[in-house]
Regions:
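Register position in tetratricopeptide repeats
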Residues: 12, 44, 78, 108, ...
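TPR-repeat structural position
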Residues: 13-17, 48, 82, 112, ...
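Canonical positions in the second alpha-helix
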Residues: 25-26, 57-58, 88-92, 121-122, ...
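Helix-start (N-cap) detector for alpha-helical repeat units in TPR-like alpha-solenoids
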Residues: 31-34, 66-67, 96-100, 130-131, ...
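Canonical tetratricopeptide repeat
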Residues: 37, 71, 101-104, 135, ...
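Conserved small/polar residues in nucleotide/adenosyl-binding loops
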Residues: 332-334
Length: 334
């Protein structure tokens, strides 16, 4: 008989020869504790088909064990065996665990409203379980039901938890407020998060909330902090540039664009915005070159073509207009 613990050690060492055969041998063992560890190990290493068979065997032995049901159903869902997962769940007595698994399953097959209904039912069975409230809040959040999501996040916060699975609840609630147009509430909620706990998206969204409240200078400070902490947050350069432009601070707007382009030479939208600013408020020749580079990156990108065409027409530079034809993607104009 296969030594299960030796098999577990070999999996940890990535010694996977004859794995299917060895797992099948292990399934004949009566050491269920070792089999459970084997199933977990297989899942942890992404060996889901083999892990699924381990948990199938254990679940058939102990059908009343909710933990085994969870592992088994999650394995079926990972293998896209949703019909079989539903069949098993239909045979299980009503419980919060069953309803949460059904919610996961329906979410996986894009039946979000059914998933929300399942979690709502689970919440009624266990009204004080913060995990159920959080799971429901997350579904509502990603479904764009921000006010309902906020109420669920608030319930979790009332338990003393402000972070679950690495997700900051103040961040989620702040984004809900932002997406709902409650910009003052969004600022207050973002301000509850210390900078050390904020991720790049938090800084970005916080800046948007300040801008929406006509606090553009504060938004600029937030974006400057973000880019100093995470210079690879490339879309931040485009947004910070627009903030400077709104304040008519064209030199800083142009420099921000150039800084972003030094990090990503193929960011065509930033090429166009920076090029346009150069033409209007800086070095027009540099601006023209940036717009041409945008066309080299994507010759089906019409915006730089239109800007250059208008510019050359105003200057009556007909040779330059003709030269633009070399950038035209003929397939896009047929």
């Amino acid at each position: 008989m296969e030594d299960i613990y030796k098999l577990i050690d070999d999996i940890n060492l990535q010694k996977l020869d004859h794995l299917d055969t060895r797992v099948n041998e292990a399934l004949t063992s009566n050491n269920d504790d070792a089999l459970f560890i084997l199933g977990e190990t297989l899942y942890n290493f992404g060996l889901t088909p083999q892990g699924l068979e381990v948990f199938r065997t254990l679940y058939h032995k102990y059908p009343d064990e909710s933990e085994l049901l969870i592992y088994f159903i999650e394995g079926l869902m990972s293998e896209n065996q949703t019909d079989e997962a539903l069949e098993y769940l239909n045979q299980v007595e009503l419980s919060p665990e069953k309803l949460m698994l059904e919610a996961d399953l329906y979410q996986q097959i894009n039946m979000t409203e059914v998933a929300i209904d399942k979690l709502t039912e689970a919440r009624e069975l266990e009204p004080n379980d913060p995990i159920i409230h959080f799971a429901l809040a997350e579904l509502l959040y990603f479904d764009g039901q921000y006010l309902r999501a906020t109420r669920e996040y608030e319930v979790v916060l009332d338990t003393g938890e402000y972070e679950i699975n690495g997700i900051n609840l103040f961040s989620r609630m702040a984004d809900c407020a932002l997406q709902s147009g409650n910009y003052s509430d969004a600022i207050q909620l973002f301000d509850e998060i210390s900078e050390d706990e904020m991720i790049s998206d938090d800084f970005f969204k916080k800046a948007i909330a300040y801008e929406k409240n006509d606090l553009t200078q504060e938004a600029i400070k937030i974006m400057t902090t973000l880019l100093s902490k995470d210079p690879d947050f490339i879309q931040g350069y485009f947004y910070l540039q627009s903030l400077y432009e709104n304040e008519k601070n064209y030199p800083d707007a142009i420099e921000t664009g150039k800084e972003g382009l030094r990090l990503n030479q193929f960011y065509k939208e930033l090429m166009v915005s920076t090029g346009s600013l150069e033409i209007e408020h800086g070095d027009a020749n540099e601006g023209v070159e940036l717009l041409k580079k945008a066309l080299e990156v994507d010759n089906a990108y019409h915006e730089p073509l239109l800007i250059l065409s208008d510019l050359f027409r105003q200057e009556e530079d007909y040779e330059a207009i003709i030269s633009l034809l070399s950038y035209v993607d003929r397939k896009s104009v047929v």
